[in-house]
């Protein structure tokens, strides 16, 4: 917000045009654009359509205008809506640096801002302005400037009582005004004229910033500026409670398809909304979009890089083709209904070549694909009950909706996610600690870490989930990561080891759960080639692909340099090629060997109690 007072206050001269000592140009002609607004709207943003308008936030200093405007801008951009925020403090450092706070200066301040906002809106952006703009006539003039250009203008009164604004008083301006050090301070000795008929009133003393943003978004949706699907909620596929009895009765009478554990894990992924906006297993159109473009394209560009499919044998197809619905059975229990099924050919070699970049049958997930049925089945999924595995870890299996609520309860203003399938060593911790530090430096006050181990199928030589969770708990107990600002939860997806293709899936799933930032390190979702032993994917490509991937617009990728053990400093550190001799790369193979043999890793590699958990697992494995 702009400084709302001045040590030198001029007499109010009214709201007429000011000469400002400048000669008015008369030899100018308005030049019409060759590009129409509709045509411009087709290429601005990721969703198409002209959305130009101005959202004019007005209110007292400390009411929350800047906070709401910045959060609104972030929300819109994250959902593919182009926008720009004009803030009072920022404008007064450049365009309006020659203006003070007298009534006539305020009038000119608002006029210039309105003209600039009109240009942004005409360019197809949602322009958000954050200014005290205390006078009704000045705000009305701003509206007329937009209406004269046939551009929507939404006045939003950010309403907080004066005593609340004084309590907030981050800059200490109210205190100075009360002491007489600032004259003409709005709300103290200069009048603020409340809007008489704003499009929206935000009560910031009663609503948090997310609620305020949602109210503005709903206004923009009502006025057809923002499409409704631009802010879709998590799409869960559980049958509503009031329809559950009927659905279960229906499921008992339907023909059925047996599914395995990995299928069931994908059912959970879909049911909990991780693959939003999918309404079930992919139909052929969705499958082809995913396979060829790594995205869903109907309703906007939505990143979804891995096929989420259900397979069937030739016998299953002959039995079920033509049915309008059938039940899915897992371990003797009917867990879901697939309605309006669509059968299409499972071209396994083509799928593997595109998803993994190899058809090597020794790759563990490719091996599973090659052994699956020759048909894929898409359809609308209705899951009957919440899925529990009864392994002592269900309390960590938080859905995207539950995670969002958890972050809200923690008053998080930034959520950064870290996906892992291995035990946490201090190199991982370095990435997470550094991200937390960077976010604080960028002005976030309560960044929260989502430590999100993968909980679905993994290959045989990976550490089982139960032991990984014990190890993660030890890392938190030792204070390597801050338990007060960390949420540990389990991501239910199977692990596909698909490198840059797979890491896009990992990233977008955390996006659905409310993450704003995603940490990516070396060789994410990669593995050695099962036959040559060399890296199947170039270790740097995962991070590079994420920074370019379409449809990952609601979060920011945080790529990091490689972390390795610094022998001189005796701790994990970022690798420096100029001091290569100081560094040691401790591979997973070596780590497992040390643990199996009861040896300790180098000092500073991993928290001691966390290493003890790992050693205990490998000892138990030796005895098995």
UniProtKB/Swiss-Prot annotation:
Recorded family membership: In the N-terminal section; belongs to the APS kinase family. In the C-terminal section; belongs to the sulfate adenylyltransferase family.
Keywords (A to Z) from UniProt:
Acetylation, ATP-binding, Kinase, Multifunctional enzyme, Nucleotide-binding, Nucleotidyltransferase, Transferase
| Keyword check for Transferase | yes
According to its UniProt entry, the function of this protein is described as:
Bifunctional enzyme with both ATP sulfurylase and APS kinase activity, which mediates two steps in the sulfate activation pathway. The first step is the transfer of a sulfate group to ATP to yield adenosine 5'-phosphosulfate (APS), and the second step is the transfer of a phosphate group from ATP to APS yielding 3'-phosphoadenylylsulfate (PAPS: activated sulfate donor used by sulfotransferase). In mammals, PAPS is the sole source of sulfate; APS appears to be only an intermediate in the sulfate-activation pathway.
The beginning of the lineage is:
Eukaryota, Metazoa, Chordata, Craniata, Vertebrata
Task: Give the gene symbol.
Answer: PAPSS1
State the oligomer form and interacting partners.
Homodimer.
Q: What class of enzyme is it?
A: transferase
User: Does the UniProt entry include the keyword Ribonucleoprotein?
Assistant: no
Q: Where is this region: Sulfate adenylyltransferase?
A: 234-624
Where do the annotations place ATP 2 binding?
419-422, 521-525, 563
N-acetylmethionine modifications at: 1
- Which reactions fall under this protein's catalytic activity? sulfate + ATP + H(+) = adenosine 5'-phosphosulfate + diphosphate; adenosine 5'-phosphosulfate + ATP = 3'-phosphoadenylyl sulfate + ADP + H(+)
Query: For this protein, what is the EC number?
Result: 2.7.7.4, 2.7.1.25
Positions carrying N6-acetyllysine: 12
What ranges does the record give for the region Adenylyl-sulfate kinase, renumbered to this chain? 1-225
- PANTHER family (alphabetical): BIFUNCTIONAL 3'-PHOSPHOADENOSINE 5'-PHOSPHOSULFATE SYNTHASE, BIFUNCTIONAL 3'-PHOSPHOADENOSINE 5'-PHOSPHOSULFATE SYNTHASE 1
Please report the organism this UniProt entry assigns to the protein.
Cavia porcellus
**At which positions is ATP 1 bound?**
62-67, 207, 212
Q: Name one GO biological process term.
A: sulfate assimilation
Q: Which InterPro entries match?
A: APS_kinase (IPR002891), ATP-Sase_PUA-like_dom (IPR025980), P-loop_NTPase (IPR027417), PUA-like_sf (IPR015947), Rossmann-like_a/b/a_fold (IPR014729), Sulfurylase_cat_dom (IPR024951), Sulphate_adenylyltransferase (IPR002650)
Descriptive protein name: Bifunctional 3'-phosphoadenosine 5'-phosphosulfate synthase 1
């Amino acid at each position: 917000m702009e400084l709302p007072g001045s040590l030198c206050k001029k007499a109010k001269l009214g709201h007429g045009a000011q000469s400002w000592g400048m000669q008015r140009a008369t030899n100018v002609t308005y030049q019409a654009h060759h590009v129409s607004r509709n045509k411009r709207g087709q290429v601005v943003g990721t969703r198409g359509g002209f959305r130009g308008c101005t959202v004019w936030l007005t209110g007292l200093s400390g009411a929350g205008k800047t906070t709401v405007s910045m959060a609104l801008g972030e929300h819109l951009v994250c959902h593919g809506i182009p926008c720009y925020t004009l803030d009072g403090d920022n404008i007064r450092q450049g365009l309006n640096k020659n203006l003070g706070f007298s009534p006539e200066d305020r009038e000119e301040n608002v006029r210039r801002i309105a003209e600039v906002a009109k240009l942004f809106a005409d360019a197809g952006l949602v322009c958000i302005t954050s200014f005290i703009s205390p006078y009704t006539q000045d705000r009305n003039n701003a509206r007329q400037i937009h209406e004269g250009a046939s551009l929507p203008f939404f006045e939003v009164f950010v309403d907080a009582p004066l005593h609340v604004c004084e309590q907030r008083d981050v800059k200490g301006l109210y205190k100075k005004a009360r002491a007489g050090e600032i004259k003409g301070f709005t709300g103290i000795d200069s009048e603020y004229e409340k809007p008489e008929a704003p499009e929206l009133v935000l009560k910031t003393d009663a609503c948090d910033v997310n609620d305020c943003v949602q109210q503005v978004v709903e206004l923009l949706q009502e006025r057809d500026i923002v499409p409704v699907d631009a802010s879709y909620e998590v799409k869960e596929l559980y049958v509503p409670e009031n329809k559950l009895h009927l659905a279960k009765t229906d499921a008992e009478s339907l023909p059925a398809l047996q599914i395995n554990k990995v299928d069931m894990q994908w059912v959970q992924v879909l049911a909990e909304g991780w693959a939003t906006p999918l309404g079930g297993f992919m139909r052929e159109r969705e499958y082809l979009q995913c396979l060829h473009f790594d995205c869903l394209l109907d309703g906007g560009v939505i990143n979804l890089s891995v096929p989420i499919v259900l397979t069937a044998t030739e016998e299953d197809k002959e039995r079920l083709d033509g049915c309008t619905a059938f039940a899915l059975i897992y371990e003797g229990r009917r867990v879901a209904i697939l309605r309006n099924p669509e059968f299409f050919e499972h071209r396994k070699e083509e799928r593997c070549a595109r998803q993994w970049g190899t058809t090597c049958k020794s790759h563990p997930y490719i091996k599973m694909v090659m052994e699956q049925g020759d048909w894929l089945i898409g359809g609308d999924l209705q899951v009957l009950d919440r899925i529990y595995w009864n392994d002592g870890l269900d309390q960590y299996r938080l859905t995207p909706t539950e995670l969002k609520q958890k972050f809200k309860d923690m008053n998080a203003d930034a959520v950064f996610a870290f996906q892992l399938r291995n035990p946490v060593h201090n190199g991982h911790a370095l990435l997470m600690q550094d991200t937390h530090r960077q976010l604080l430096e960028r002005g976030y006050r309560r960044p929260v870490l989502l430590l999100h181990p993968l909980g679905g199928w993994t290959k045989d030589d990976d550490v089982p989930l139960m032991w990984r969770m014990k190890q993660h708990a030890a890392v938190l107990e030792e204070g390597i990561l801050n338990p007060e600002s960390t949420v540990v939860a389990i991501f239910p997806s199977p692990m596909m080891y698909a490198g840059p293709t797979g890491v896009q899936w990992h990233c977008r799933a955390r996006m659905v759960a409310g993450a704003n930032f995603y940490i990516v390190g070396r060789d994410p979702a990669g593995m050695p080639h099962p036959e040559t032993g060399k890296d199947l994917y170039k270790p740097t490509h995962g991070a590079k692909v994420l920074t370019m991937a379409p449809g990952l617009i609601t979060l920011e990728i945080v790529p990091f340099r490689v972390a390795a053990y610094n022998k001189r400093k005796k701790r994990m550190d970022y690798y420096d090629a100029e001091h290569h001799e100081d560094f040691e790369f401790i591979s997973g193979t070596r780590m497992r060997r040390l643990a199996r043999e009861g040896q300790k890793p180098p000092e500073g590699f991993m928290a001691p109690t966390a290493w003890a958990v790992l050693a205990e697992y490998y000892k138990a494995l030796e005895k098995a």
